[in-house]
């Protein structure tokens, strides 16, 4: 039984109450009693509206399901369908032209295009690594990944391989030629660096010194001039590059110019995630996340890290200080990524707080209140709050996921306004990032943005969740195409193009981020370097990466592409059509061979089991899960949603049977067990699937997938994780 504290109409779990009262409120000017009274009033006032919005989702879905069932025979009539969606209010009127007016936004969001990390906030080590990923070693990122091939004796091995190192150096030199070119010649021939009359000069041999083609790219240096250990700071497209020189270092001693590393400004922004990448089902889990968020904002989060036989304490990096080119002043740059926090959406409740009748309170309301409170510590430097700030403009950046349409965005805006009143913050301090990952938001994106025109700081596409909603919305329309074919569908390109077009049309360029989705293949960095440049070329000022290393590699793309120049080329264009956006990804004909159907079912069942077993048994919400071909993929609830919804759709339309699903799950459980055999804490599923809560959760996600709200996986996952935790506690 959870120990609770009575706060007006609310019953707050003791662990949460004590943390907020004793830790989160400390160092603010807020009175605890007044704060908790404000929490009570916000919950009481806004809960009915949240419930109404969820009821509206259900009502629209029921009408769409009925419409499709009535037209099960015969071809899909696109015009009739569009008219129907308009009549029921699913498609809303265009709000007309406008420009967003969000003010007080940090440069990292408004004018600096670069990578964005998303990291589970419940894991302190991951959170610290991500916050510190503002700067990353290009040499390390190249040496440790497949961007540098193993050919010609360049294998990684257990010790430094000079052949591989030379390949890294050559690659980095070529990158510098593109990002900060010399007036003549190439960095590949550099034998020395110096500063003369406030300008960088590079020796190309035989005492031939050349400057930069763009002298203004040199913005600072560290160390004493003439010292063997120093560095040069360059800037290109708003991002910084630091060339570290130390001829006595192991790498520098092998380099004819003494360069030991090239450091890139990498993860310009990071999302600390309370949503799809975490498994937070109760007060204990929520407090862990809130405490880490507090440490990040106060600047005192730390974690003991062991590597081999060494243990050290990881902390947040300080800011970086350089001498200006003429030697007369200082330039200070942020040492850490600018932090967003992603709250949960409008659907879920959490028993960290209940009302007087025992009903769980909406988790999104809790998150807004508590992450907003905690973020106050990141707005100022003081003895109580620590030496590090997050925002330098006094803003709090909250990503709000899984909103369906403008009314839900308007509700978020009103919720944030109420939170500001409770916290004593100026109106519009809490900024909102809108995830464009639900179909009704995509179709009404401009109206969604208008509802938050004075708070919005980003829009971001999320292909996997968006596909999950695409399938669920049209569950009754017929069987969908295979998962791998989704990316080639007309609605996908229209979706990605429209997000950029609408963002530009509403004034995002220079004011807010236009974001694109995650690279999920964590080990295939050569492919990422080749392909992910397409996102900035499409107008994205940021795109998601799965690791600090990936952030450094993806940062190269923003040196190769001037995104704000791309915006000028795209402004005024409307590349996406509503007809394409409304094209349902139905299979034209069921021409799959039995082995193709089995392959699709097995692929999805294996993916579901591999993710769910770690969610349920280990409380891990974001995993590097090997697929059926043993390729490591970054999985979170979004990938689970699309896999479970596709199989639920095929089950609904008779492409597969319930027995097909159960048979595949049992077969794939053995595969997942084998893939996790080296994990001493892993509990095998295949030996007794009926008693494995994780296996039963995976099966339920498919068999009951058609009836889950919007196809979301959270209700089943949360219930099953609580069941597992209770079974362990009672053992």
Swiss-Prot record:
GO terms for cellular component: cytosol
Give the main localization category: cytoplasm
Q: Which residues, renumbered to this chain, carry the PTM Cysteine sulfenic acid (-SOH)?
A: 622
Q: Which UniProt keywords apply?
A: Cytoplasm, Glyoxylate bypass, Magnesium, Metal-binding, Oxidation, Transferase, Tricarboxylic acid cycle
Q: Which residues does the record give as acetyl-CoA binding sites?
A: 118, 125-126, 277, 314, 546
Q: Which reaction does it catalyse?
A: glyoxylate + acetyl-CoA + H2O = (S)-malate + CoA + H(+)
Positions that bind glyoxylate:
342, 437, 462-465
- Residues that hold Mg(2+) according to the record: 437, 465
Membrane-spanning intervals of the chain: none
Q: What does it do?
A: Involved in the glycolate utilization. Catalyzes the condensation and subsequent hydrolysis of acetyl-coenzyme A (acetyl-CoA) and glyoxylate to form malate and CoA.
User: What name has this protein been given in UniProt?
Assistant: Malate synthase G
Native species: Mycobacterium sp. (strain JLS)
Q: Which gene encodes it?
A: glcB
């Amino acid at each position: 039984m959870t120990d609770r504290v009575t706060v007006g109409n609310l019953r707050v779990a003791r662990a949460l109450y004590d943390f907020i009262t004793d830790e989160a409120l400390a160092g603010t000017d807020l009175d605890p009693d007044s704060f908790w009274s404000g929490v009570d009033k916000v919950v009481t006032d806004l809960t009915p509206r949240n419930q109404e919005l969820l009821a509206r989702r259900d009502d629209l879905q029921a009408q769409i399901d009925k419409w499709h069932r009535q037209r099960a025979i015969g071809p899909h009539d696109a015009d009739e369908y569009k008219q129907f969606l308009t009549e029921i209010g699913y498609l809303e009127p265009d709000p007309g032209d406008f420009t967003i007016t969000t003010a007080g936004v940090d440069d990292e969001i408004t004018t600096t295009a670069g990578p964005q990390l998303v990291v589970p906030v419940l894991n302190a080590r991951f959170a610290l690594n991500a916050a510190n990923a503002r700067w990353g070693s290009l040499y390390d990122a190249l040496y440790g990944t497949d961007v540098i091939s193993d050919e010609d004796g360049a294998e990684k091995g257990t010790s430094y391989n000079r052949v591989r190192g030379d390949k890294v150096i050559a690659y980095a030199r070529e990158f510098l030629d593109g990002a900060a070119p010399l007036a003549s010649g190439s960095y590949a021939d550099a034998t020395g660096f110096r500063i003369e009359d406030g300008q960088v000069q590079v020796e190309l041999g035989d005492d031939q010194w050349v400057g930069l083609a763009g002298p203004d790219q040199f913005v600072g240096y560290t160390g004493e001039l003439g010292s063997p250990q120093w560095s040069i700071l360059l800037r290109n497209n708003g991002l910084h590059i630091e060339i570290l020189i130390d001829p006595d270092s192991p790498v520098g001693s092998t380099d004819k110019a003494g360069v030991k590393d090239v450091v890139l400004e990498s993860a310009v922004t990071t999302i600390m995630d309370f949503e799809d990448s975490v498994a937070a089902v109760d007060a204990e889990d929520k407090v862990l996340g809130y405490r880490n968020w507090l440490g990040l904002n106060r600047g005192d989060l730390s974690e003991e890290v062991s590597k081999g036989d060494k243990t050290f304490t990881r902390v947040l990096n300080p800011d970086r200080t350089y001498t200006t080119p003429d030697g007369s002043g200082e330039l200070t740059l942020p040492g850490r990524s600018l932090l967003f926090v992603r709250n949960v959406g409008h659907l879920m409740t959490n028993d960290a707080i209940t009302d007087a009748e025992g009903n769980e309170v909406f988790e999104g309301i809790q998150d807004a209140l508590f992450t907003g409170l905690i973020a106050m510590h990141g707005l100022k430097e003081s003895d109580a709050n620590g030496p590090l700030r997050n925002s330098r403009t006094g803003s709090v950046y909250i990503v709000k996921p899984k909103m369906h349409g403008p009314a839900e965005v308007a509700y978020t805006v009103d919720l944030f306004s109420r939170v500001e009143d409770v916290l004593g913050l100026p109106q519009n301090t809490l900024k909102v990032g809108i995830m464009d990952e639900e179909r009704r938001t995509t179709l009404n994106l401009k109206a969604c943005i208008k509802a938050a025109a004075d708070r919005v700081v980003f829009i971001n596409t999320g292909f996997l969740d968006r596909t999950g909603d695409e399938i669920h919305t049209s569950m009754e329309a017929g069987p969908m195409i295979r998962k791998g074919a989704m990316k080639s569908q007309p609605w996908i390109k229209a979706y990605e193009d429209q997000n950029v077009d609408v963002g530009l049309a509403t004034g995002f360029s220079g004011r807010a981020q236009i974001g694109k989705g995650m690279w999920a293949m964590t080990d295939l960095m050569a492919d990422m370097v080749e392909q992910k440049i397409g996102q900035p070329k499409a107008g994205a000022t940021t795109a998601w990466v799965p690791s600090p290393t990936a952030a450094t590699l993806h940062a190269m793309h923003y040196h190769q592409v001037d995104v704000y120049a791309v915006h000028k080329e795209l402004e005024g264009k409307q590349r996406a059509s509503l007809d394409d956006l409304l094209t349902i990804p139905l299979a034209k004909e069921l021409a799959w061979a039995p082995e193709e159907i089995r392959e699709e079912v097995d692929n999805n069942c294996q993916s579901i089991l591999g993710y769910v077993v770690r969610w349920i048994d280990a409380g891990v919400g974001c995993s590097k899960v090997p697929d059926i071909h043993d390729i490591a993929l970054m999985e979170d609830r979004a990938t689970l949603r699309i896999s479970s919804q596709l199989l639920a759709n095929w089950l609904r339309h008779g492409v597969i049977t319930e027995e097909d699903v159960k048979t595949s799950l049992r077969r794939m459980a053995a595969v997942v067990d084998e893939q996790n055999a080296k994990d001493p804490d892993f509990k095998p599923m295949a030996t007794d699937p009926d008693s494995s809560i994780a296996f039963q959760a995976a099966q339920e996600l498919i068999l009951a997938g058609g009836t889950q709200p919007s196809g979301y996986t959270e209700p089943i996952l949360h219930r099953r994780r609580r069941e597992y935790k209770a079974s362990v506690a009672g053992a």
